[in-house]
């Protein structure tokens, strides 16, 4: 994703943020393109929320430039901010008001018609909860409401901060599907998380932030492929350990780690040539968190 084939929705150039003598962000630069989901990854205090607040205009950057749909945030903030939707904090909800009342307030503020209210109420999937006060909502319901409100004006870019916090597995699954729907309908997404595995099968790219600096950028497909792990049931596991340097045994089960499809094919050929019978082989869910821990250790 990206390159010259896609429109640049967001461009962050050399952005720094300093409060007194503390440099919270240090020369951050990246771009987000049309129909792309990008994850901002890092531990608590890395600077994820700060860069998001700079992009949404909640914080003023000390240095750098931010462009949203070709509008300069500093010199033309009104037009720049019209192109983004923000889903950052639940406190933006009024606890005594219902979901339906929130949609009406947002529609009035954005000058939207009743048809758009109906569309986004349906998208929120709140059902009977639409007419209950939000103080009685579950975390999942609050997240769906905040997300739908952020999408009311069909923004080109959605900013969403740690969306899975406090959600149960079903709510996370539902949220992931909604984010993919949003992307497929033409909105790019920048979301933050401190868990790399949350981006699996969702994001196109991951931006890794540590101590206010962008330390690495990775394509998610490449990241998964380069760390593929396979579980094998074979006739002679100990012999495989001698044949393949990329194999290991964990809890009495044989695994093989491959950095490419070519290495995977070569490894299988070695087993066949040495008369090792492979009874079963399965790709294990990518251990992205191990990669994350290795990147941030020390």
Question: Which residues does each PLM region occupy?
Answer:
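ABC-family P-loop ATPase nucleotide-binding domain
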Residues: 1-16, 298
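Alpha-helix boundary recognition
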Residues: 5, 82, 122, 184, ...
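ABC transporter nucleotide-binding domains
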Residues: 10, 17-191, 196-197, 201-204
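Residues at or immediately preceding the N-termini of alpha-helices
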Residues: 61, 73, 77, 220, ...
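Residues that scaffold the ATP/ADP-binding catalytic core of kinase and kinase-like folds
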Residues: 76, 223, 291, 295
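Structural motif detector for alpha-helix initiation sites
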Residues: 99, 220, 285-288
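ABC transporter nucleotide-binding domain
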Residues: 176-258
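Short, charged/small-residue-rich alpha-helical element at the C-terminal edge
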Residues: 229-298
């Amino acid at each position: 994703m990206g390159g010259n084939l896609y429109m640049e929705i967001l461009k962050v150039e050399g952005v720094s943020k300093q409060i007194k003598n503390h440099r919270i962000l240090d020369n951050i630069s990246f771009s987000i393109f049309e129909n792309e989901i990008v994850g901002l990854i890092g531990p608590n205090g890395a600077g994820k929320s700060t860069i998001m607040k700079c992009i949404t205009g909640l914080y003023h950057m000390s240095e750098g430039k931010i462009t949203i749909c070709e509008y300069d945030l500093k010199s033309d903030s009104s037009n720049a901010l019209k192109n983004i939707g923000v889903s950052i904090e639940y406190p933006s909800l009024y606890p005594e008001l219902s979901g339906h009342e929130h949609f009406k307030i947002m529609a009035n503020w954005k000058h939207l018609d009743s048809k758009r209210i109906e569309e986004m109420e349906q998208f929120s999937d709140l059902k009977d909860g639409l007419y209950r006060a939000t103080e009685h909502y579950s975390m999942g319901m609050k997240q769906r409401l905040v997300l739908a409100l952020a999408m009311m004006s069909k923004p080109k870019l959605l900013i969403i901060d740690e969306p899975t916090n406090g959600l149960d597995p079903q709510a996370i699954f539902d949220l992931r599907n909604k984010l993919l729907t949003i992307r497929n309908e033409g909105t790019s997404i920048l979301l933050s998380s401190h868990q790399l595995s949350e981006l699996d099968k969702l994001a196109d790219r991951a931006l890794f932030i540590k101590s206010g600096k962008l330390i690495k950028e990775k394509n998610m497909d490449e990241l998964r492929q380069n760390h593929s792990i396979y579980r094998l049931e074979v006739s002679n596991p100990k012999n495989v350990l001698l044949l393949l340097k990329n194999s290991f045994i964990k809890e009495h089960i044989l695994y093989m780690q491959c950095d490419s499809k070519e290495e995977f094919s070569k490894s299988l050929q070695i087993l066949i040539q040495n008369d090792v019978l492979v009874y079963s082989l399965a790709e294990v869910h990518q251990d992205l968190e191990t990669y994350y821990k290795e990147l941030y250790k020390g």
